[in-house]
Structure formats: C-alpha cells, structure tokens
Amino acid sequence: MSFEIEEFTFESSNKLNKIYGKMYIPVDVKLKGIVQICHGMCEYIDKYINFAKFLTSNGYIVCGHDQIGHGMSINSDDNLGYFAPDNGYKYLIEDAKKVTDIVTEKFPNLPVFLFGHSMGSFISRCYIAKYGETLSGVILCGTIGPQPLARAGIKLANLMSERKGSHYRSKQLYNIALDFANLKFLPATTRFDWICSDKDEVLKHVADKKCNFLFTVSGFKDLFNLVSLCNSPKVIKTIPKDLPIFFISGSLDPIGENSLGVKRAVKLYKDAGLSKVKCKIYPEDRHELINEKNKKEVYEDILQWIEKVSK
C-alpha cells in the first residue's frame, strides 16, 4: 500500500524554535485512525520510517515531529539537546499537543493513539495526565519506573547550569543518567549496545549525527523533571481512568530496570484506579523495541492492541 508524506512546521510553545513534523498518509484506502509518534532522547521522527510504513499499510495515518533540540527542530547545532531557558519539559508536552491538534484538524473524527518511546514515553505520560481525554489510547515503549534520585539529578543539573551555563555539556551528568546502561552488555562494542540487540541498528545510531550527541545540562534537568513527574502519583491520578494504556518493554532494557521498573510504573497506574492498563515484556529484547530483531512481532502486537481497543 502506498502513502503520501506531508511535511509541516509550527512555532514551538517555547517561542524560540520552529518545529518540523511529518504525516504519513495512506492512499486509496479507508482511514482507520491516527498514530502519533513521540520520539526519544537523541532521536528524530525519520528514525520511525519502517514503523510508519507498517502502520500506513494497515490504514493508519502516522504523524510526529522532531522535538525541540532534535533533528530539524533546532536553530543551530549548539541547541542540540537544549529545550528552553526554563521549564523546557513543559514545552515538550505542549508541542506534542500541538501536533495532535494539527493532525486532527486535517483529519477530524478519527481515533488518535499516542506512541511514546523512552523520553517520548515520559512526555506521553505527562501528556495523558493533562490531555488524556483527547486520545483513544497510548502505547508506552521503553519507559521508566519511579526514580528517587531524579530530584537529586535536577539539583545537580541546576548547580552545573549556574556555574557553567545552561548550554554546558557534562559527561558527569551523562554518566549519572546513562553510564549504567551498558553494564549488562560488557564487553561492549559501542556505548550504545544497550539500545538494541541488532548490531546493524546500533551502528546506524552511532554513525548518525542526529542521534550521537550529548544533552546540555539544561536538557538533562528537563529530562529528570519528566522522569519525576511521569511517576508522580499526583500526576497519575489525573489520567482518565478508562484510557487504554499499553506498556511494552524489553526484559533487558536498562531504562526499565530489566522490566522491574516498568512493572512498578504499571502498579502505580493500577493503584490509581486506571482500569485498562496492559503490559507486555519481550524476552531478551533491549531498549528500542521497534528496531529489535523481532520488530515485526512488536509491530503486530501494537496493531492488534490498537484495533482491539478501537472496537
């Protein structure tokens, strides 16, 4: 099945960036719904092209944007991994809502499903706490559980920002946030072995300048804020109780603490009275499920879940 690509731009809610986005629109087929992709840290929407092709072949419009500080939504390379002088995490959430508004204005009356991966899942979890009633479901891929040290990370990032400036790039902060990720995969070939068991995908990630960069200290502060907020019981209790939510994670994903953190997040949601929460853990898979060796299985599971909750 063929599809058309429509590009769009809009002013970020931070009033500083022009945000670049794409829609993948199936041609000559009855449209079933919309899947909006919220990409992860050090990614961009084009990384999801294979996933988008699969979904469009099954009648779904796919849309997404390069988030602030990523891909084509930067003012200069100096702004890679930088969101705003203050409260950048809030603008990430609002920009995702703007994308929803853009695509639903063009294609009204279709169910919208939000797919968030990694950092994008943190954003998505905050999004559904504020705008959950606009969605028909959400898929949370490679997410994280409660992290008591997130608040300490925010304080350290603030301190570094005051001393070095908000655009400073700290290997120390990176090590605190992600250095642990490769430990289970030693001896590692690259510092990104943890993202996927498919070595070709890892090497593509390493070679891609749009993926292989270090966040600013300000960006890390916003990341830690998202981690703290998305696991906050106060935030979770504002999610619509009947919103269908599908957690997916690899059993060897260090971000999800090898599934333990994800299961804690699922428990938080169920304890808050959310009645339509499902979770699937994929044995031996790592962080980027949609790029894993069994990605076709993952794609099919997502499609089947969407079609089931759409009935």
Regions found by a protein language model. Name each.
Residues 247-249:
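Short beta-strand/loop motif that positions the catalytic acidic residue
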Residues 35, 39-43, 118-119, 251-252:
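Active-site glycine-rich loops that stabilize anionic/oxyanionic intermediates
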Residues 45-78:
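Conserved alpha/beta-hydrolase
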Residues 124-210:
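Alpha/beta-hydrolase-fold enzymes
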Residues 1-28:
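N-terminal cap/lid segment of alpha/beta-hydrolase-fold proteins
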Residues 107-118:
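Alpha/beta-hydrolase fold nucleophile elbow
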Residues 84-104:
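Alpha/beta-hydrolase active-site loop
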Residues 272, 276-311:
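Catalytic active-site module of serine/aspartate enzymes centered on a nucleophile-bearing elbow/loop
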